[in-house]
């Protein structure tokens, strides 16, 4: 079967579909792809993938499904934190929030630029998405694993139920906000380009 470097929950899902899941350190990924040790690798986004050179040894770039968002964490010993004066706690909290905001914005910007470069500079790379059939199978396996984990772990169940409830609300707003904007402005741009070309 397909030999795929994909860790954690995404790896569990892929494994249920018959994929041979591997976990390989980042420093060995390029060579593993080049030598055929693995057939595919899940990493991050264009701003991380292209600098690692994956486009040189892999001709297909699939859009992701397993990580709709990333979570950035900082772990501080509670006793150490409580010993800090309040002003230093405030400074640290503000600094962490600013660093997260900067990282998110910088990554978004770099992804925009590099995604455009992929299409122009690397014509060998074919951008694909999984078929509806594969997505349904991935969804089914995902739901099964989530249900199993919820039965075994009350904390997991509580967190997952909370996330599901928020996701239902978030989807509604995302469709109204982001999707509607992209859809409507895309139509306007297409119409303007069509008119500018002299066709009506």
Where in this protein do the model-derived segments appear?
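N-terminal secretory/targeting leader peptides
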Residues: 1-200
């Amino acid at each position: 079967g397909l030999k795929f470097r994909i860790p954690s929950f995404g790896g569990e899902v892929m494994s249920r579909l018959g994929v041979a899941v591997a976990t390989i350190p980042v420093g060995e990924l390029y060579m593993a792809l080049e030598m055929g040790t693995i057939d595919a690798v899940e990493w991050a986004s264009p701003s991380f993938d292209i600098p690692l050179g994956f486009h040189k040894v892999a001709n297909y770039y699939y859009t992701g499904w397993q990580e709709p968002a990333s979570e950035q964490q900082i772990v501080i010993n509670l006793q150490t934190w409580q010993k800090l004066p309040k002003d230093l706690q405030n400074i640290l909290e503000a600094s962490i929030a600013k660093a997260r905001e900067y990282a998110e914005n910088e990554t978004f910007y770099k992804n925009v630029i590099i995604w455009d470069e992929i299409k122009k500079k690397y014509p060998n790379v074919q951008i694909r998405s999984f078929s509806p059939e594969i997505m349904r199978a991935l969804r089914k396996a995902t739901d099964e694993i989530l249900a199993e984990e919820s039965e075994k772990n009350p904390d997991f169940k509580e967190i997952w139920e909370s996330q599901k409830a928020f996701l239902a609300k978030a989807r509604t707003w995302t469709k109204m906000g982001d999707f509607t904007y992209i859809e409507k402005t895309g139509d306007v741009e297409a119409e303007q380009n069509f008119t500018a070309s002299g066709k009506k």
